[in-house]
Amino acid sequence: MARAAATAERGASPHSLKREYYDALRQLTLELAGIQLGRDHAFLIETRLASLARAEGFPSLADMVDELFATGQNRLAVRVVSTLLERDTRFFSDMRSLQLFAGVVLPALRRADLGRPARILSFGCASGQEAWTLAMIARQSVAKLGGEPPEIVGVDYPSAALERARAGVYTHFEAQRGLPIRQLLANFEPAGPDGTDWRVRDALRRNVRFEDFHLLSRLDPLGQFDCVVFRGSLRRYSGPAQVRVLRGVTQVVGENGFLLLGTGDAVPHVGYGFEEVDGLSNLLRRRVVKPVEADTEAEPKRTRFGPG
């Protein structure tokens, strides 16, 4: 009641914000996620956060933002930022990078004879289409070449999009965008009250999971991965955030593991212990540092601290 009264007193529309709040929300997004929203994002801010305000039980968007900056709620701040950063993702997008995954990464991991299922990280997985796409490609590879299907882990900020990824349910429109009909029928089943949605089948779901994760935090708790897939969003980050994100993802890539970026992406200042595969800027592999073998027969150097 108090919130509604405050809104009425302001005489503002349920979706209007104080002008200074736009700058504050852009700064919050930069600080929490390392991504700078443009000054032309006012419409995006209002439309996306209006839905979140209703879901959170606020009578208006202005009331939610007032409370966010008055109390500094960490949970609400994360929800706000993750809602602002939700990306429109689709199945089998950026086929050139997916061809590298299918034709280079998976065969190399199979030849490595890991003695366990390979582990693949979908970093910034949004609503899950990338992770499910990787799982479908891997399933085809296993059917053709043998071996075990990899474990695929999708991580992103907690959001409604991530919950949809976990549910594995997509509208007919979403399923049609990029998903070949054979893949749709083999890996999805009709869902929803009228059967017009599509749900991931258990056979595909078995090796895929999704986790809430702050993408700028250390990834060590997730363990080591044989390939980190980070496609199409590197350029969204500010310069310092790019360095922080790349340090995080490269630290969890195991020996001989891969980092797969989107087509056109590249690691700034190539390094981080990786080298390009076949001159491709978006496919990197961890360099293996060979230990130097000691020459046991060599005569020790004579120094004043040494023998003699």
Summary of predicted features, one role per range:
Residues A2-L121:
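Conserved AdoMet
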Residues G115-G128, E151-V153:
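Conserved class I S-adenosyl-L-methionine
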Residues S127-L145:
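Conserved SAM-binding loop of SAM-dependent methyltransferases across substrates and taxa
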Residues V243-E255:
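A short glycine-rich, Lys/Arg-flanked "PGG" loop and its adjoining helix->strand segment in the class I
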Residues E255-T263:
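Conserved beta-strand signature within the Rossmann-like core of class I S-adenosyl-L-methionine
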Residues V270-G308:
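Core SAM-dependent methyltransferase catalytic element
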